[in-house]
Curated annotation (Swiss-Prot):
Catalyzes the transfer of a dimethylallyl group onto the adenine at position 37 in tRNAs that read codons beginning with uridine, leading to the formation of N6-(dimethylallyl)adenosine (i(6)A). SUPFAM superfamilies: P-loop containing nucleoside triphosphate hydrolases. Its cofactor is Mg(2+). The lineage of its organism: Bacteria, Pseudomonadati, Pseudomonadota, Gammaproteobacteria, Lysobacterales. This is tRNA dimethylallyltransferase.
Length: 327
């Protein structure tokens, strides 16, 4: 079998608050790379503090791609991400640099590296109609509707998973075929790069939970609520009938802050809900990552040497990297 001649890339994966951003920036500086963000919140303009978006200094230190692609009232699909990510990777390689994919959105990683089954594109009007229907009858009723239309998909989608219920119904209403049909169709071509997958994950869950809580408190101190107030004040956001169903507002932390500003509970309760929602997100991310059988796992604080050796061996170089911090 011929050797794989595709250019090399590194994927820095892991649950939220595990230190991916810091490691990706450090690796890019050390090995000559550019960062491709793999995060479904960072594609939205205005989601900065609450999404831990790399700041101006970080972007000045290392080129970043796929940030601020859409306004918060717009929709951005995994298929769009796959196309944009592959374009970015090709451009980075053409410049003689190493693409470093970094983030925590598993669907985006899969779309960029493995391809997605061909599926109807998102239709904002259909999504809004489904959201309006959910306001009337509830998402549980829409999940029951999905079970009648597509029992295979309904069995895989939890009755409280609004985003996936909405997408499954949207696909059916657009195409007349259930989403499970589309998911069995052949995926796109493989990625134009050969990837080393690195998973950053503290071995002790308590460590990750502490990082999550600490990061949220820092975000609140840095003005997260003011950021959400500014989003709410945008005329285009005020015109949306069900803003809580927008993908941008569904981002962890933003929903809880939005509901607090709507008058639901105290700030302390909102903070605790956001911490809990972020823990649940981290749990889902870890579950998905365990299915990445070709990924190599590292504790960001304990496995310094092994992480360095993995990168150096993959890239054919032997150099040291500075200790990444939790970002």
């Amino acid at each position: 079998m011929a050797a794989d001649q595709r250019p090399l890339a590194i994927a820095v994966m892991g649950p939220t608050a595990s230190g991916k951003t810091a490691l990706a920036i450090e690796a890019a500086q050390r090995w000559g790379g550019e960062i491709v963000s793999v995060d479904s919140a960072l594609v939205y303009r205005g989601l900065d503090i609450g999404a831990a978006k790399p700041d101006a200094a970080m972007r000045a230190a290392v080129p970043h791609h796929l940030l601020d692609l859409r306004d918060p009232w717009q929709v951005y699909s995994a298929a769009e991400f796959a196309a944009d990510a592959r374009t970015a990777m090709a451009q980075i390689v053409a410049r003689g640099k190493i693409p470093i994919l970094a983030g925590g959105t598993g669907l985006y990683f899969r779309a960029a590296l493995e391809g997605l089954a061909q599926m109807p594109e998102a239709d904002p009007a259909v999504r809004l109609a489904i959201a309006a229907e959910a306001e009337q009858v509830g998402w549980g009723a829409l999940h029951a509707q999905l079970a009648r239309i597509d029992p295979v998909a309904a069995a895989r989608i939890h009755a409280t998973d609004r985003q996936r219920i909405q997408r499954a119904l949207e696909v059916y209403r657009i195409s007349g075929k259930p989403i499970s049909y589309w998911q069995t169709r052949p995926a796109g071509p493989r990625a134009p790069v050969r990837v080393l997958k690195l998973v950053l994950a503290p071995r002790q869950r308590a460590v990750l939970h502490a990082r999550i809580a600490m990061r949220l408190d820092v975000m609140l101190a840095d003005g997260f609520l003011t950021e959400v107030e500014q989003l709410r004040a945008l005329p285009q956001m005020r015109a949306v009938a069900a803003p809580l169903d927008l993908p941008a507002v569904r981002a962890v932390g933003y929903r809880q802050a939005w509901e607090y500003l709507d008058g639901a509970g105290s700030l302390a309760e909102s903070r605790d809900k956001a911490v809990q929602a972020t823990r649940q997100l981290a749990k889902r991310q870890l579950t998905w990552l365990r299915g990445e059988l070709d990924a190599r796992w590292f504790d960001p604080e304990r496995d310094r040497g092994q992480l360095e050796q993995a990168v150096a061996g993959f890239l054919g170089q032997r150099r040291t990297m500075q200790q990444p911090s939790a970002v």
